[in-house]
Amino acid sequence: MVVKAIARNSIGRNGVGAFVFPCRKITLQFCNWGGSSEGMRKFLTSKRLDKWGQEFPWIQFEVMRKSGHPLLRAEYTNGREKVICVRNLNIDNVENKLKLLKDSDGDILRRRTKNDNVESLNSSVRGIWSPLHAAKRHRI
């Protein structure tokens, strides 16, 4: 009996000694004619997108000319996608929304319960543990 492997794409995971950037691809969609795309068109004609491409070479930037309101669409390594409509926003607000998508991790937004976060004025007695700064004998 022959055993066949299951064809699946691997999901990027962060772990000890490795960091995988969560944002994989950002698509900038705009209309060449519509007035709501004016801020997006100004962003694309300025050199700001070139700076973003040089600063973040691991993110693929795609520019699409399509009728309708301008959109920013981000694809993440966990397979999720986030879309933000940037109609009637100026060039600075478009860049802020682009930064928001870049810094996001693609997870579903969840409501935090009462005991999810503990805030204290005192520092931790044990200190903050980090796998990158642990002694070699404690690493797995």
UniProtKB/Swiss-Prot annotation:
GO biological process terms, semicolon-separated: cell redox homeostasis; mitochondrial genome maintenance; mitochondrial translation
Coiled coil residues, start to end: none
GO terms for MF: structural constituent of ribosome
Phenotype upon gene inactivation: Has a respiratory growth defect. Shows complete loss of growth on nonfermentable carbon source and a gradual loss of mtDNA with replicative cell growth and an increasing number of generations.
InterPro entries: Ribosomal_mL43, Ribosomal_mL43/mS25/NADH_DH, Thioredoxin-like_sf
Cellular component aspect of the GO annotation: mitochondrial inner membrane; mitochondrial large ribosomal subunit; mitochondrion
SMART domains: L51_S25_CI-B8
Chief location category: mitochondrion
UniProt entry keywords in alphabetical sequence: Mitochondrion, Ribonucleoprotein, Ribosomal protein
Location relative to the cell: Mitochondrion
Family: Belongs to the mitochondrion-specific ribosomal protein mL43 family.
More details: Present with 3400 molecules/cell in log phase SD medium.
Oligomeric and partner information: Component of the mitochondrial large ribosomal subunit (mt-LSU). Mature yeast 74S mitochondrial ribosomes consist of a small (37S) and a large (54S) subunit. The 37S small subunit contains a 15S ribosomal RNA (15S mt-rRNA) and 34 different proteins. The 54S large subunit contains a 21S rRNA (21S mt-rRNA) and 46 different proteins.
Protein name: Large ribosomal subunit protein mL43
Organism: Saccharomyces cerevisiae (strain ATCC 204508 / S288c)
Gene: MRPL51
